Amino acid sequence: MWAPERSAEEQGNLTRSLGSSEDCGSVSVVFPMTMLITGFVGNALAMLLVSQSYRRRESKRKKSFLLCIGWLALTDMVGQLLTSPVVIVLYLSHQRWEQLDPSGRLCTFFGLTMTAFGLSSLFIASAMAVERALAIRAPHWYSSHMKTSATRAVLLGVWLAVLAFALLPVLGVGQYTIQWPGTWCFISTRTGGNETSSENNWGNIFFASAFSFLGLSALVVTFACNLATIKALVSRCRAKATASQSSAQWGRITTETAIQLMGIMCVLSVCWSPLLIMMLKTIFNQTSVEYCKVYTEKQNECNFFLIAVRLASLNQILDPWVYLLLRKILLQKFCQAVSQKQREEAATLIFTHLSISRTEPGEARVLFSKSKC
């Protein structure tokens, strides 16, 4: 049940296609090792910051959002810990995947893990976008209905639904197969074959298409909700333009939030769109990237597919920085810049007063003490 079925011709082609994957082992192993280390550090740091903020009383209104960030960081970190070590061991051992995994069960587990954790990240990002949009556009409904228990239920529901979808190949709908250059497994996009395998081919088409459409749908929901949030923030900022201090504060908040949301949309689109669109393209064109070493004319397509998968994996590293860590760093830099500017303005003002009215030194200390960020 766990082992993907292959014909004799397919097995021979696959063996030839993966034979040269050992040649790039010493070079390519740097990529998964770097991703594992950076991803683990970033997500662990994000989880630490979330746990500290979650315990504070003043963050009660942010608990739903903090739960989503913590769940996303945990999802990304566990996904990397389950997949990256397998790739590293395969590169360092200079073995083909079939030598390391003759039964094919590890391949199925690897593909299931990539599918489940990849879709989970996308859907959690969508849930966070919906949560932000509701908090900004419907604050009264949000405060009365959006409890932490509801957030936990939604996150758990996302996880269970994605896991059920990823288990479809185990039940016979779709396949997880070895992908070029033979160091990882993922959803099969193979659509050709003889009549005996037509049922498997239709299963491959359905499963791969469903994965792509689900991923693209999650991206669309995230984009729509983030744009709605930005629009609502800009409208509220204009409405508060009557009071200068309130207007300046809301302008700063709107700018920071808009930059962060646009950064999230850019990262998601760059990391996931190439893989999802290319999977649909290979299905509609009835092509496959599983036998790259056999058909040399597909070499460019195979290289692009590998880059697309690496970009999707890179999203697990960028998530904690885009959602939490980078925002904290930018806020600290902003505070330092404002504080420095206030000190310079205070020093200029003090120098002017001293030169004109010979102000007592005690007043300078008072002005400096009020110029803190």
UniProtKB/Swiss-Prot annotation:
Residues 1-30, 90-108, 175-204, 285-304 are extracellular. Glycans are attached at residues 13, 194. The keyword Methyltransferase does not apply. The chain crosses the membrane at residues 31-55, 69-89, 109-130, 153-174, 205-230, 261-284, 305-326. It is a multi-pass membrane protein. GO terms for cellular component: plasma membrane. Pfam families: 7tm_1. Disulfide bonds join 107-185. The keyword Lyase does not apply. Residues 56-68, 131-152, 231-260, 327-373 are cytoplasmic. InterPro entries: EP3_rcpt_2 (IPR001481), GPCR_Rhodpsn (IPR000276), GPCR_Rhodpsn_7TM (IPR017452), Prostanoid_rcpt (IPR008365), Prostglndn_DP_rcpt (IPR001244), Prostglndn_EP3_rcpt (IPR000265). Residues 1-23 are annotated as: Disordered. GO terms for molecular function: prostaglandin E receptor activity. It comes from the Eukaryota. SUPFAM superfamilies: Family A G protein-coupled receptor-like. It is found in: Cell membrane. Keywords: Cell membrane, Disulfide bond, G-protein coupled receptor, Glycoprotein, Membrane, Receptor, Transducer, Transmembrane, Transmembrane helix. PANTHER family: G-PROTEIN COUPLED RECEPTOR FAMILY 1 MEMBER, PROSTAGLANDIN E2 RECEPTOR EP3 SUBTYPE. Belongs to the G-protein coupled receptor 1 family. Receptor for prostaglandin E2 (PGE2). Required for normal development of fever in response to pyrinogens, including IL1B, prostaglandin E2 and bacterial lipopolysaccharide (LPS). Required for normal potentiation of platelet aggregation by prostaglandin E2, and thus plays a role in the regulation of blood coagulation. Required for increased HCO3(-) secretion in the duodenum in response to mucosal acidification, and thereby contributes to the protection of the mucosa against acid-induced ulceration. Not required for normal kidney function, normal urine volume and osmolality. Interacts (via C-terminus) with MKLN1. This is Prostaglandin E2 receptor EP3 subtype. It comes from Sus scrofa (Pig). The gene is PTGER3.
